[in-house]
Each structure stands twice: as C-alpha cells, then as structure tokens.
C-alpha cells in the first residue's frame, strides 16, 4: 500500500513538470536525516537503470499521444495538427537531454526519486498512527469513570470528582404495615394455642394462666416488663401426668402424623415452669415435691425437716392415733395379700416400707384394671391363720400371668367392711413425710411408724358410718374451700399418747385446685351395712367402667362371686361410664377354675357398631356376614377356640390372623395323611383341604378362603384349583 501510494505521488510530480533545484549534497544530507528519523520502517530497494529518464520520457510521450488520439474525436483535424507539433517538440527536447548526458549527474536524479518515495511513506504511516490514537481516545471518553494514571501522585487523586450515591428513602407506611401483620400473626398463634389447649383440657383458667406466665417470662428476659419478676409461679398452672396423657391421646387421635418430637415440644411448652420451680423452690413447691433420697442431702434434710410441714402432713399423721387392734389394708403391686392383721406390728411396718419403695420407683396409674383381683389372697378381718400352700401357688401363678396393674382398694374403720376404689390419679399425691427422728418414741410398740409411702384418701363413706365413727370430728375438706378447727389434731412434734383412741380422717388435697372428690354428705345411705368381721363379704365402690371389667375377671374364678350391686352416685364428670356403684364380693376357699374358661374379649361398655364388628372380622380373617347377630356369634365362636402356639402352650380365643394360622397348623398336625402330602409337596385341592380340616374342627367353616390361601402360601403348601382332577 505504501509503495503504491508513493508511486502515484511520483507520477503526479513528473507530470506537473516540477523540478527540484536542491544540490546533490543537500539531498544526500536530508536523506541521511530521514533515515535516522524513521522508526525502523524498511523501504524496498528499487533498482533504476541508466535510461530510466528516457523510459519515463518515452512513456510520457506515449501517454500524450494516447490523449491526443482521444481528443481527435471531439475537436477535429485542427487539434490533431497541434498535438502532433507538441509531440515533436517533446521528442526533440528529450533527444537534446539525452545528447547532453555527459553534462548531467545521474546520481542526483536517482537519489531524488528515492528520497521522495521514503518521505511520503513515513509521513503517511505517522498520520495513520495519529488517527488511531485519536480514535482510541474518543472511545475512552465514553466511559463514566475517569481515567487514572498509574504514575499519578496520590495527592491528585483527591482532586478528582467522585459521584455520591443518594440514599434511598424508606417507605414508613410499608414498615408500619409489616409491623401490624407481624403482631397479628403472633396474636393469631397465641389464640390458636389457647383454643387448642382449651379443647383438649377444658380448663380455660389454667390455659390462660399458662399463656400469661409464659408472656411474662419472655418479657422479663428481654427487659420489656419490669414487673414481670413480681409474677408468682404457681404449680396450679401446669398439667399433671394424667392430664398430659389425656391431652396426648387426644392429639394422637386427631393428628395421626404427630411425631414424638412434636409431643416433647408441646409438653415443654405446657410444663415450662417445672425447671424454674426446681431451681427456685418456695414453700408451696417444696410441700408438693418429695424430698430427694440422695445421701449428699441427708444432713440438709435432718436440719430443715421441721420447717417444711404442710397442713396435709399434719392432718395425715397417723403415728399417734393408730390402734393396735385395728387393721389397715394397703395395695400390693407385687401380688402379695391385700390385708394383714394389726397384731403383727413388725410385719406391718415391713409391708409399709415395701409399698413406699415400690411407689417411689414406679409410676402408679390412676385408673388401674381389676384383672389383678382374680387370684389375690383376700381374707376377712380378724382371720389370723395362714393361707394354705395351694392358695399361695395359685396366687403366684395368677400374678405371673397378669399383665395389668392391680386394683387399688382401701379400707377404713372397723366393723364396716367398706373398700374404696379410685378411678383417677389426682388422689395419689406425694407428700413430704415427717422424719421419725424429730418425734419422741411412742409407748405402744404395735403402732407402725411413719414411712415414706403414698397415702390414699377416703373416697366416700355412707352417712351411717360417719355418724357412728366420726361424731366428734367435723368434715374437713381443703378441696371444698372450707376449713374448721378440730380439737383432735395431733402435732407431729409432740407426744401423741394422749390421743391414741382417736380416729383421724384422710384429708384429700387437690394439686390443681379443682375439687374432684365427692362430698361425703351427698352419698346416699346404702341398703347393706351390717357386715360381720368373720364374714367374707366385702363392699367395693367402683365406677361403671371398672365394674364391667370386674365382672369379666371374676368369671374365671370360683372363689369370688358378685352378690349385690347398687348405684351410689351418678355421673360427676360428664363422661360416660363414670357412675359409681357399690358392689359386694363374696370370697370362698374354693380355688377350682370354672369349667368354661372362655371369656368374650369383645365385650365393651357400649354396644359396638356394625362397622367395628366387621373390622374385627377382617382382622381375624373370618368370612364376612351381613347381620350383626351373625357377626357377634362368629366372634364369640372365635373367642372360644383353643389354639396351641409353637411352645405347645394352649390359648383360648383368637384375635388375629397369626393365631388363626397357628390353629390351622395344629389341625394339620393331627391329620397324618394330610401332613404326608404336604411334606411330599403333593398338590391338594382347596375343597379337600377344607373338608379334612372341617372334620377336625367346625370353626374352619367360619374362616375366609383368602385367609386359608394366605396360610398355605406362608407354609408352602401346594394348592390347585378344584376343577382339576388327580
């Protein structure tokens, strides 16, 4: 490109006839300076011959001639003559120059042409570089940020303009709306928790107290509320174990996907005050929590035991008023006898210690089953002879087979034969017991000492018994909100020998503050009250729900008989099955079991619905039927079937498909021909298998075919269709 541009410039220079009068030495000097000024640009060498000028002249002449020929067409013959003359003159001049060749310096002409070409190329390249720089600078000016030179001093950095960002304006209205929505969501969650707990427990005041105390606790931590520390932490705002069990059962039924972690979170939410109460106990809290048996705290217990006495402890102290000829029954969770004679005082003390240790290590259920009553040694008051070995063996056997806790029975007074069964755990409360070391020794050695056992308060008594035994004692019930001074109270720190002939009543105290015990004056007079000490009839006050279980339990025993049954009090809590009945149990020494041990396991308090009965049929694997009476008959038949398990132990009644499978397997083992075909993997038709099993037991007709096929698949028995022949 540079060479072609230089060639064009040179041609224009020759055509215009411009001549350079610069001396040869000066041209050479300029050419040398131009060489030093260049930035390394190399120009290709051009070899000019001696007759370059002649060639150029001839070329110029030919060009003029060519132009002349072109103009002839336009101007005519006159122009042709003029151009021919000019051509002739040019040729003569050229000839003259060539003839004077000796006088002309050829080096000057050659150097002149080279210098012109070199200068034009250098100038053009520098112009191109300058244009590129301008273009780049123009592009850089489009940037928002100012160009910073690396070599620039730091003092000049501050002089440049720096754009400041304008702060964004916040919408105060939007923030206010967000705060309102957040407060609404918090209040909504609190209302939901409040309503849920009210539905589950039915105690509005307790739920409100929980929410209120929890809010005070949170505000006291954050420092928002200064008077939060003045709020008293009362144990009446927490739920007991039985209340929490009831709430958890309702949650399980309503929310089937509830996990154990959710239960723990809800329990911590409800009983959040428990840890705080343990850290900072007050007088009321200490009176409701049992003293720890830790050895490290033994000295503390001995020093401060006298300052932690509650009214319930003072009223419940029996150490100074027990009579030697009176007997006090107690509950035996380990299956021992219920009642002991009071003459053996040392044995009674040991028994009370066993009960206290058992109750402190086990969680006593409030509603206990009556199945433990089946084989227990119940003998009448005043009976001092030992039970027979046969009775002892039977009791131990029945206790081992019993899977349900014993029935709680309590007996009070003399010559009345009254026993009371409790259906709620609210009556079982731990009391701070009074250490015997702070009391003076008692004269009567037959009186048992105070031990750390759970006291069972009297549930109810007939009015006649109260009139006979408690003429001088007023009715004291802390749960009813009334209190009257009684002159027969015994102090635990004084000698109680002056009141040995007195009778004391159990004072029921309520942990939650809600009265649940019956008013003794509201109990009607029972039609049977004349019980002899030597008789073997015992009176029990029991709920309707437990009465049904008691009837089923005594069916298998011949030594216990239910003779009388009377309703004492109607429903008190608004729940079905909570009515109270007074029943009389007759105990005999006949220990033989009844001939028909079958018990209908499907007996319920209410008549089950048809859908529930069909579910029971499907669970066992029996054939479906339409009528409810037929379903009940089939279930009754299933409850009387005798099965043999893998350990060759007989069981009465089937309640699942696995027990039906054991029943069918037992029938197959009794048929040698059928057993041989099964062992040899010979195919058996379904009809043949059912017929052979039916011959052994007619209960097979009630079993569904699908259940039988499932049993054959489990054992690997080859079954084929009935239409195929052998």
From Swiss-Prot:
Pfam families annotated for this entry? Slx4
Q: Which UniProt keywords apply?
A: DNA damage, DNA recombination, DNA repair, Nucleus, Phosphoprotein
Record lineage: Eukaryota, Fungi, Dikarya, Ascomycota, Saccharomycotina
Function of this protein?
Regulatory subunit of the SLX1-SLX4 structure-specific endonuclease that resolves DNA secondary structures generated during DNA repair and recombination. Has endonuclease activity towards branched DNA substrates, introducing single-strand cuts in duplex DNA close to junctions with ss-DNA.
- Which Gene Ontology terms describe the biological processes this protein takes part in? DNA recombination; DNA repair; DNA replication
Q: Explain the post-translational modification.
A: Phosphorylated in response to DNA damage.
Q: Assembly and interactions?
A: Forms a heterodimer with SLX1.
InterPro entries tied to this protein: Slx4_ascomycetes, Structure-sp_endonuc_su_Slx4
Q: Where is the composition biased (Basic residues)?
A: 161-173
Q: Does the keyword section mention Cell wall biogenesis/degradation?
A: no
**Subcellular location field:** Nucleus
- The gene behind this protein is SLX4
Q: Give the highest taxon in the source lineage.
A: Eukaryota
Gene Ontology cellular component list? Slx1-Slx4 complex
The family classification in the record reads: Belongs to the SLX4 family.
Task: Please state what the protein is called.
Answer: Structure-specific endonuclease subunit SLX4
Q: Which Gene Ontology molecular function entries are recorded, alphabetically?
A: 5'-flap endonuclease activity
* Segments of this protein annotated with the region Disordered: 156-187
């Amino acid at each position: 490109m540079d060479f072609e541009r230089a060639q064009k410039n040179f041609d224009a220079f020759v055509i215009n006839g411009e001549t350079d009068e610069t001396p040869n030495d000066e041209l050479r000097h300029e050419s040398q300076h131009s060489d030093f000024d260049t930035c390394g640009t190399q120009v290709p060498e051009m070899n000019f011959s001696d007759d370059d000028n002649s060639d150029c002249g001839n070329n110029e002449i030919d060009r003029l001639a060519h132009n002349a020929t072109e103009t002839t067409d336009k101007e005519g013959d006159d122009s042709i003559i003029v151009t021919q003359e000019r051509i002739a003159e040019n040729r003569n001049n050229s000839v003259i120059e060539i003839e004077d060749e000796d006088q002309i310096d050829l080096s000057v002409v050659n150097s002149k042409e080279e210098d012109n070409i070199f200068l034009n190329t250098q100038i053009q390249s520098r112009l191109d570089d300058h244009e590129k720089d301008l273009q780049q600078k123009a592009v850089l000016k489009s940037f928002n940020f100012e160009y910073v030179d690396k070599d620039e001093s730091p003092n000049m950095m501050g002089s440049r303009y720096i754009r400041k960002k304008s702060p964004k304006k916040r919408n105060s209205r939007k923030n206010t709306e967000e705060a309102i929505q957040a407060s609404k969501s918090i209040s909504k969650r609190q209302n939901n928790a409040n309503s849920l707990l009210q539905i589950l427990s039915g105690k509005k005041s307790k739920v409100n107290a929980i929410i209120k105390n929890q809010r005070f606790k949170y505000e006291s931590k954050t420092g928002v509320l200064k008077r939060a520390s003045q709020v008293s932490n009362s144990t009446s705002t927490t739920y007991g174990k039985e209340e929490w069990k009831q709430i958890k059962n309702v949650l399980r039924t309503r929310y089937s996907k509830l996990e154990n972690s959710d239960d723990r979170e809800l329990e911590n939410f409800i009983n959040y005050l428990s840890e705080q109460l343990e850290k900072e106990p007050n007088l009321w809290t200490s009176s409701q929590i049992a003293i720890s048996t830790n050895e490290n705290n033994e000295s503390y217990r001995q020093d401060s035991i006298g300052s932690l006495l509650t009214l319930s402890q003072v009223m419940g102290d029996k150490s100074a008023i027990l009579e030697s000829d009176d007997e006090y029954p107690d509950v035996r969770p380990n299956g021992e006898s219920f009642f002991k004679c009071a003459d053996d005082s040392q044995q009674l003390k040991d028994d009370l210690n066993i009960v206290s240790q058992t109750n402190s290590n086990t969680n006593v259920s409030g509603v206990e089953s009556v199945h433990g009553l089946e084989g227990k040694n119940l003998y009448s008051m005043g009976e001092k002879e030992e039970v027979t070995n046969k009775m002892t063996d039977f009791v131990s056997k029945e206790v081992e087979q019993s899977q349900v806790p014993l029935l709680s029975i309590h007996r009070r007074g003399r010559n009345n034969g009254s026993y009371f069964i409790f259906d709620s755990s609210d009556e079982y409360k731990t009391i701070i017991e009074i250490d015997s070391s702070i009391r003076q020794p008692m004269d009567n050695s037959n009186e048992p000492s105070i031990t750390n056992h759970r006291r069972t308060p009297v549930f109810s008594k007939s009015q006649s018994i109260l009139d006979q035994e408690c003429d001088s004692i007023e009715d004291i019930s802390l749960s009813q909100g009334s209190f009257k001074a009684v002159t027969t109270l015994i102090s635990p720190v004084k000698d109680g020998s002056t009141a040995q002939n007195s009778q004391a009543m159990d004072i029921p105290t309520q942990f939650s503050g809600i009265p649940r015990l019956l008013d003794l004056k509201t109990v009607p007079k029972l039609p049977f009250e004349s019980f002899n000490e030597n008789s073997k009839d015992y009176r029990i006050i029991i709920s309707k729900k437990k009465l049904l279980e008691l009837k089923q339990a005594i069916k298998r025993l011949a030594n216990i008989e239910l003779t009388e049954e009377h309703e004492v009090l109607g429903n008190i809590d608004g729940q079905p099955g909570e009515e109270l009945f007074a029943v009389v149990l007759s105990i005999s020494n006949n220990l033989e079991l009844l001939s028909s041990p079958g018990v209908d396991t499907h007996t319920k308090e209410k008549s089950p619905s048809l859908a529930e009965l069909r579910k029971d049929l499907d669970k066992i694997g029996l054939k479906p039927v339409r009528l409810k009476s037929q379903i009940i008959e089939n279930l009754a038949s299933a409850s009387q079937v005798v099965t043999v398990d893998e350990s060759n132990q007989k069981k009465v009644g089937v309640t699942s498909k696995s027990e039906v499978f054991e029943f069918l397997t037992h029938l197959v083992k009794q048929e040698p021909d059928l057993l041989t075909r099964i062992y040899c993997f010979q195919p058996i038709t379904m009809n043949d298998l059912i017929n052979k099993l039916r011959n052994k037991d007619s209960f097979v007709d009630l079993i569904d075919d699908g259940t039988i096929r499932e049993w054959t698949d489990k054992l690997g028995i080859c079954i084929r269709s009935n239409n195929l022949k052998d």
